[in-house]
């Protein structure tokens, strides 16, 4: 019995296999060649400066190890009343919280700050009355620039089923930026503000070099996203800047007839 081999088919099959293998080798070699032409990965590794170690709080919202505690529930040593700068802060301290004392004016920090991370908790009283801007109104003024309600205001107000103009509701940069959301809790519940503040910069001649910027989380919800502030808060007219340096933080005694609001757990981390 004679065995016949189709040499044409054999040679064609062998040639195809050889071509496929060669193509794979070329592709692999080309890949290695391309990698050889790239910069070494070490050239884009940064090793210094090493970030400082900050021990976080054991409970969310409490101050981390490097924070300056502005109110610890025990005293008002970090605060003063602008109306009487040499005396103690006039608000009421009881049961680990401070409550606005109507008619005494605002309180502000004794220290001044530039750029920082800031945390504060507040409570609208459960028996709150009034409506609109006359319902649990207060405010946080960053870089307070005078004795009264001056600086850049983040609004504090009852925002739970309380209608008012939207650039004046809770979470707004008052009369400048509408909040991205209304994250208000019911009156009687504690609420939080977490803020990243970048102070404005000024040229030697007093003109603005870069505006203040602010990011705000209200009860953990982003309501202001690195917005540029147009100038100091004003009730009437357009905001504007005047040159200043580091400034204190001021809590407002608004003066409306509704029941006073309370604050606790206030701290700050300077950003340098």
Which residues are covered by each model-predicted region?
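Bacterial Sec-dependent N-terminal signal peptides
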Residues: 1-34
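Carbohydrate-interacting regions of secretory-pathway proteins
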Residues: 32-272
């Amino acid at each position: 019995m004679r065995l016949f081999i189709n040499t044409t088919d054999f040679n064609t099959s062998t040639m195809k296999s050889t071509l496929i293998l060669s193509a794979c080798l070329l592709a692999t070699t080309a890949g290695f060649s391309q990698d050889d032409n790239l910069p070494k990965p070490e050239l884009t590794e940064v090793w210094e400066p090493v970030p400082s170690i900050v021990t976080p709080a054991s409970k969310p919202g409490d101050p981390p190890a490097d924070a300056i505690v502005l109110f610890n529930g025990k005293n008002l040593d970090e605060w003063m009343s602008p109306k009487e700068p040499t005396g103690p802060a006039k608000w009421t301290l009881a049961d680990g919280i401070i409550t606005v004392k109507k008619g005494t004016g605002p309180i502000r920090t004794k220290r001044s700050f530039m750029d920082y991370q800031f945390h504060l908790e507040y409570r609208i009283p459960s028996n709150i009355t009034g409506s609109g801007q006359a319902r649990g109104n207060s405010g946080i003024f960053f870089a307070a620039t005078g004795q009264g309600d001056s600086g850049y205001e983040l609004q504090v107000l009852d925002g739970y089923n309380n209608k008012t103009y939207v650039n004046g509701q809770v979470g707004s940069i008052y009369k400048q930026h509408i909040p991205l959301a209304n994250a208000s809790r019911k009156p009687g519940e504690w609420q939080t503000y977490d803020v990243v503040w970048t102070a404005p910069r000024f040229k030697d001649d007093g003109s603005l070099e870069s505006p203040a910027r602010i990011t705000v989380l209200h009860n953990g919800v982003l309501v202001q996203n690195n917005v540029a502030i147009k100038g100091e808060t004003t009730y009437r007219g357009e905001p504007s800047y005047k040159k200043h340096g580091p400034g204190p933080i001021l809590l407002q005694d608004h003066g409306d007839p509704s029941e006073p609001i309370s604050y606790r757990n206030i701290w700050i981390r300077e950003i340098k």
